[in-house]
UniProtKB/Swiss-Prot annotation:
Localization terms from the record: Mitochondrion membrane
Extra remark: Present with 1890 molecules/cell in log phase SD medium.
Stretches that traverse the bilayer: 35-57
Keyword Ligase: no
Primary role: May be involved in cell wall organization and biogenesis.
Single GO cellular component term: mitochondrial membrane
Keywords attached to this entry: Cell wall biogenesis/degradation, Membrane, Mitochondrion, Transmembrane, Transmembrane helix
Protein name listed in UniProt: Protein ECM19
Length: 112
């Protein structure tokens, strides 16, 4: 008779979890939506942060490269005023594109 009581308890317990499983499914779906929204929000915030960070540090980096003598001269470099505002992009004479290299001529086959 003891095994019957235990079986009944198990059946009643498993029956009561069916209702809670539906609730848990809804809760998991809600958590997944919340997690997805959080990840998208963090991604957008990171993109905005990187964009504004590069816009902020670009004049500082260009100035430092110019002082060190490591600034490339083959590309146009934007000019900034003392406040870091973009003045004008002026292409320098050395930034004119060079002629593309000519392809090597194929070797002539030996005549027989």
């Amino acid at each position: 008779m003891d095994w019957l009581k235990n079986t009944t308890i198990v059946v009643l317990f498993s029956h009561s979890t069916d209702k809670s499983n539906k609730h848990k499914k809804r809760q998991v779906q809600c958590n997944m939506r919340k997690n997805t929204l959080d990840m998208v929000t963090i991604g957008i915030a990171c993109l905005v942060g990187v964009y504004t960070g590069t816009r902020f540090f670009e004049p500082i980096v260009i100035d430092r490269l110019r002082k060190d003598g490591n600034l490339r001269t083959d590309i146009p470099i934007p000019e900034y005023d003392e406040d870091g505002n973009l003045l004008k992009v002026t292409p320098s004479l050395s930034s004119t594109p060079a002629a593309p290299p000519t392809p090597p001529t194929p070797p002539t086959p030996p005549q027989q």
